[in-house]
Amino acid sequence: MKPLSSPLQQYWQTVVERLPEPLAEKSLSAQAKSVLTFSDFVQDSVIAHPEWLTELESQSPQADEWQHYAAWLQEALSNVSDEAGLMRELRLFRRRIMVRIAWAQTLALVTEESILQQLSHLAETLIVAARDWLYDACCREWGTPCNAQGEAQPLLILGMGKLGGGELNFSSDIDLIFAWPEHGCTQGGRRELDNAQFFTRMGQRLIKVLDQPTQDGFVYRVDMRLRPFGESGPLVLSFAALEDYYQEQGRDWERYAMVKARIMGDSEGVYANELRAMLRPFVFRRYIDFSVIQSLRNMKGMIAREVRRRGLTDNIKLGAGGIREIEFIVQVFQLIRGGREPSLQSRSLLPTLSVIAALHLLSENDAEQLRVAYLFLRRLENLLQSINDEQTQTLPSDELNRARLAWAMDFADWPQLTGALTAHMTNVRRVFNELIGDDESETQEESLSEQWRELWQDALQEDDTTPVLAHLSEDDRKQVLTLIADFRKELDKRTIGPRGRQVLDHLMPHLLSDVCAREDAAVTLSRITALLVGIVTRTTYLELLSEFPAALKHLISLCAASPMIASQLARYPLLLDELLDPNTLYQPTATDAYRDELRQYLLRVPEDDEEQQLEALRQFKQAQLLRIAAADIAGTLPVMKVSDHLTWLAEAMIDAVVQQAWVQMVARYGKPNHLNDREGRGFAVVGYGKLGGWELGYSSDLDLIFLHDCPMDAMTDGEREIDGRQFYLRLAQRIMHLFNTRTSSGILYEVDARLRPSGAAGMLVTSAEAFADYQKNEAWTWEHQALVRARVVYGDPQLTAHFDAVRREIMMLPREGKTLQTEVREMREKMRAHLGNKHRNRFDIKADEGGITDIEFITQYLVLRYAHEKPKLTRWSDNVRILELLAQNDIMEEQEAMALTRAYTTLRDELHHLALQELPGHVSEDCFTAERDLVRASWQKWLVEE
């Protein structure tokens, strides 16, 4: 065994001072001193349990001792009689065995492959033991779940990721998917439960047993987000539901994840074989599938962007040449050829890598370099995590932990270790780029003329700039030179390292050459330099623009077209990553795919890290807004589609925010008990105004109200029991908080809940019955107008149907025409007096006479006036389709409806484009005169003369 290095020998004295007397007095072996010096986790554990150290000294860890884990744990659980006892014993067993694994790993008593096997088998043993104990307990409590033939149904657990592959980290969370075979109900219990309810409740208890922190710690952090539909999907699915999902909706990234899926525990039973056979066709295609390369390339791009966003420098998992790239290399061959080559269908990386070499898919040299690099990186990762039992892949910056790792990895010092690490990661990166790297060869632009470099370096006299700036006016030339000079002065005020200066000196001549070729060079340069000032200390973003000429080109064209986009990029430079791929930049997410894209995006963030979750939501929204705006500018999205995309994006955000708030509230209080025997959450979010009418703009806020169907006597079922209606109030407050909290990425949306019954004076969340009663007996006409543009944007089917029925009933009430006309007209006149244009000789597109609001009032009036006779008028909540309905139902002549639709979309289009230019929503008084005259005539016809 290698002696401790000098820094570690000094640290040993600190360790001695921490040890209790029985250990301090004891003559510790050299092995014990080494491990206690290396790992604070082992130190803390043996201080709390000195007998573990005695056991380690007398029974040194062996490579094959994982075979005894199940028997050892069974003995530990033999006297457990309740869930609290189960939780305690599982935690103590996990910690004891992890100390043994850390001991063996630190001293290199066993191979790294054996360490990975032990870590994975320990997790599986604990998961299966907890499941089996809880299954028996739940069957005693609720009866045994059976299928139609009366056969008992088990809970099957898929271990995903490294757990499934038998390659678990030292300190890792576990990704699981729960499934049961067939529908049916319980037998032998006090009352019948269907299997879905039984397994959902059992699954919740299993997660609690493994995941909930106690004074003994936790067993594993459990992540269930890889299941179908993610957090919004059922916790446990039947085989049939799983099969339907993966056949109909399974995404490429889910196929990638499923490669490593392994059934925990008895994997040879009938049901296990059935589940495995069902999933295999989804993962391994019968044909050779080269489309997977682009999918994996896209996923790697997402990871690279995440590394930049979160500043994950020195990350041996996600960085270039890291563990993830080796995994991608191996899985590319599995996904492309696994359907034809059964030998590639292994879940574990190293055996699969050997098969890849044997099939000559990679050269023996490349495969061997990857194998050696993988074992090196995994040992480094596990040692790093075993210092504090902490889930990290980022190399330490402090001297002590660097000395620890250098010693444990058998290097003289930190520079020697990092030198070897760099060599391994360089080898991995080379193979990765050859296989999965961008398929377009990066061509170097022709070298720029020396004059552009001199212009940037301020080496040109003003007269010398004439050739490169000759096409610009004298004023623009002076402005460009001033902007360059001012930018250089700003740089002098900032701390930019040598690498940053080097990248800037390469980037700026290219940038100036492209910008100054434009007629609007001065304006564009002013926007871009404002952005660059914000990122000059973040070299990775400068490198992005320097190394990807296409990204620089898109940056220039978008900043030239829209100061709003320039401002967004300056405020949130992480959006620069979106410029890398024009296929996605100018092609917004499909309207029905926002929820799934967001779900995939959030999977990269720890579920229990609220701060990162909030940031991720905001970053996703900003990236999607950029793509929508880019497509808008490029003319590929008409105004109606812009609003559709903005609305679908908002709905995806609402879905995710409600999900996060729900998880947080249930963790604190439990669920309201009226939900125990039904699906869903008993909660709905209703969108009003632009959201309800599918008419959101770039900076629109969200008008929301919250409904629940909780009975008066309901209580929550958690340890901190509260009134059920109080639960929904706190849920709504939490939702508002998640939307409105300002992080470094800003707020998510401004949310206005004042359209709820009784406005700001009313309860934030309302029961469905109280909402219906208010609308029937207390609401004003303007509130019924608002209801025309309202719809459920999140909610259970029952609540959605209830709201739709109330809305339809209210809109179909018989109304006296003259009275309604007067009330609507007077409300509009009040609004105009309050909100109308205060700018002389300007037309406010939304608020002034002949503008958008007049059109909205016309449609609302006509729906309320005629829905009693024409119920079909209640179908839609957006103005364009309401105008279509008015024509189809012979309320309005088709010619007038089409003309109002054209006027409406024209005015909204102008508002979108003014927003992109960061201009207020008013224009010269002589603009849109034809549209305004048309709207005025229609207003006169319906709301004055009739």
Swiss-Prot record:
This is Bifunctional glutamine synthetase adenylyltransferase/adenylyl-removing enzyme. It comes from Shigella boydii serotype 4 (strain Sb227). GO terms for molecular function: [glutamate-ammonia-ligase] adenylyltransferase activity; [glutamine synthetase]-adenylyl-L-tyrosine phosphorylase activity; ATP binding; magnesium ion binding. Residues 449-946 are annotated as: Adenylyl transferase. Involved in the regulation of glutamine synthetase GlnA, a key enzyme in the process to assimilate ammonia. When cellular nitrogen levels are high, the C-terminal adenylyl transferase (AT) inactivates GlnA by covalent transfer of an adenylyl group from ATP to specific tyrosine residue of GlnA, thus reducing its activity. Conversely, when nitrogen levels are low, the N-terminal adenylyl removase (AR) activates GlnA by removing the adenylyl group by phosphorolysis, increasing its activity. It catalyses: [glutamine synthetase]-O(4)-(5'-adenylyl)-L-tyrosine + phosphate = [glutamine synthetase]-L-tyrosine + ADP; [glutamine synthetase]-L-tyrosine + ATP = [glutamine synthetase]-O(4)-(5'-adenylyl)-L-tyrosine + diphosphate. The lineage of its organism: Bacteria, Pseudomonadati, Pseudomonadota, Gammaproteobacteria, Enterobacterales. The gene is glnE. Residues 1-440 are annotated as: Adenylyl removase. GO terms for cellular component: cytosol.
